[in-house]
Design a protein with these regions (language model features):
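A helix-coil-helix interface module used to build multimeric assemblies
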Residues: 2-144
Length: 144
């Protein structure tokens, strides 16, 4: 079904779409998935910087490659995560599995078990959502 003002869930993405379109980069499901990926990656980097003993040999020069996972996040990446979610029936777990696949591509298999280490889904959501609000305010509502 094509999204129109008549079949949208709310007037925000229906009748007012022309005024709220820029907010989809912050508040759409794809955006939430991207923010979750960002939080998971930055948390992993934070564990490396502690340094957590098991991550002490992680090369900090790889941090930018890790960040590129969310900095270059695409709609196809979001679709991959949704496909994983269709198996896991868990949105945040699907993000974790996606990142583990990305670690495999980067040949970082030895560190995969520290993705989402010590976290709950609420830890991710309760950080991702406020970050999306903060960014929307600074980049859309109150731009420089």
């Amino acid at each position: 079904m094509l999204l129109t003002a008549l079949n949208a869930i709310s007037p925000i993405d229906g009748r007012y779409r022309s005024k709220t379109k820029s907010l989809s980069a912050y508040f759409s499901e794809e955006a939430l998935i991207k923010y979750r990926v960002q939080i998971e990656i930055e948390y992993f980097i934070g564990l490396c910087e502690l340094p957590l003993p098991q991550l002490i040999d992680f090369n900090p020069s790889l941090f930018e490659e890790l960040r590129s996972i969310y900095l270059h996040f695409t709609s196809d990446d979001a679709l991959q995560i949704k496909e994983i979610e269709s198996t896991t029936n868990h949105d945040v777990k699907a993000v974790e599995y996606f990142i583990k696949k990305e670690f495999d591509k980067l040949e970082l298999q030895d560190y995969k078990e520290f993705i989402h280490f010590g976290l709950t889904s609420q830890d991710i959501n309760n950080t991702a959502i406020p970050l999306s609000v903060k960014n929307a305010i600074s980049e859309v509502y109150l731009p420089n």
